[in-house]
Amino acid sequence: MSMSRAELQNAASRAFGDANLAPDAEQSWQLIADMGWLMMTVPEPLGGLGLGAEAAGVIHSELGRALVPGPVIAQMLVIEALAAADQLAERDDLIARAMGGEVMTASLGGSGAFACIPDADRATHLLTIDANRIALVPLEGAKMTPRETWDKTRRLFDVVLARDAVRFAIAEGDAAAALASRLDTQRHFALAGDSLGGAAAILALTIDYLKTRRQFDRPLALFQALKHRVADLKTQHAAAEALFWSRATGNAHAIDMAALKALATTTYRTVTEEAVQLHGGIGLTMEHHCHLFLKRALLNCALGGDADHWEETAGRHALATA
């Protein structure tokens, strides 16, 4: 199947463009499954659309633009891992269920106790990821504790697996290390897309506000100091977005994708922090939509390693390979 980036963007915009920001979690998740977005990157022989990383980038960007809740990133990690599990007898059935919308979530690493698991209370399975073993574990009998977070568009849980939990082995040893690296790369790319979509949305809302809000009988958008601030934000976002789409070929080195995640999430944070200021007094009220974007930006910065960590790692890698 072939579908252009513009066609995908139009489809996603029609689905969520007219909705309120941060739509209902259950309804939006069902819509995501019905639209087939969970099967975007799954190879066609496994029942997917086989559209590749660019299609996934469009979806993550548009979902971030509308602040759509739900464990889309985690679900896609699960599906990607299952697609690589050639020896798992239950693979095809599990992939079909995941693509159909049965919630399966993923950890960021470790074993036994897991922190910050998206939508664990709705999930039937948890993908456990580390460098030595990757497995899918049913969540029956697991202990789940909601984690308080500033981002109200997403729900995170700390999970302790049951002692007798059955594990569906996906990869071990060198194969697990290679797959874990690929999943890390996919997660970085997804978070970058979510961040740049959100940054574009709040920047557009801020520009609209500056055009309509008047002071001294003039729209705020005519004040040169404010125009320069917005132009700087637009330039920063455009540069990050250009890098994002250049990485959508799927051939980027893992460290390059981590650096992209650091740049995109930092851009998102900068844009949202400036948006709060540019909205003036109303932007400081907790009920204003600026804070929905700001808090999502802050969580995106933290997930999977913050910008300082990845920038230092990328710098060391560049020096070592120079």
Residue ranges of model-derived segments:
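Amphipathic, small/basic residue-rich leader segments at the start of a protein or domain
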Residues: 1-72, 315-322
